[in-house]
Amino acid sequence: MIKYNCSISERGVSWGLVGESVKENDTVENLDRLFKAAKGGGYEVFISPHYLYPADQAWGFGGAAERMMLEGKEFFRPDPLSLEGLDSSGADWLDRYRPYIEDGKTVVVSPHKVWGPQTNDLVLQLRKRRIGRVILSGMLANLCVESHLRELIEQGFEVAVVKDATAGPRHPDLGDGYEAAVVNYNFIANAVLTTEEVVAAML
């Protein structure tokens, strides 16, 4: 789903919160394995990007993680109509994923704004392709991934979450986002799988 420098790179502004979880899950490598298997097996791949623009800095309220995101300028792009400054920024893809995402076949939908796909066209793009089953991965486990899971389930999709192809923040006051997410995945998703299980099923 989403694999940005901000949230998955050691250079990213979120690394202090997510780094341990990313390394423990081997998230970067597992996402690469999923991309490779999906592309090799002819599966359609969708990216639900998370972008924030200067106008979004004027928001008057938000939750704790939302405020951290805005204050840290995570996923920030200076202009919604220009790609200037995007390359290698926190809002850019990890370089190792670029060949998969920019192959002319991956569907990059319009950006979501907070956590879920209610504000973008992911559901429309899936329905227009008569896709009813989704394998979900990406960042962050308890925020965007869980929010996408909940909305896709509500919209009638069957959703499997790849639990080691995601990671979550660990905050001294707010808690362990990854552990919280996995509990909810087990309650909500149609399946909770490992990368190894998904890759084996795709071959």
Question: Positions of the model-derived regions?
Answer:
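A short, N-terminal amphipathic alpha-helix
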Residues: 25-44
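Short acidic, Gly/Ser-rich segments with clustered Asp/Glu that frequently serve as metal-coordination loops
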Residues: 1-7
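Ser/Thr-centric signal marking residues that sit
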Residues: 27, 48, 166
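Active-site-adjacent betaalpha module
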Residues: 8, 36-41, 58-59, 64-203
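Short, conserved micro-motifs enriched in small and acidic residues
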Residues: 21, 25-28, 143
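Short beta-strand segments at enzyme active-site cores
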Residues: 43-50, 162
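Basic, amphipathic juxtamembrane/active-site segments
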Residues: 9-24
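Catalytic-core segment of enzymes that process non-peptidic bonds
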Residues: 47-56, 62-63
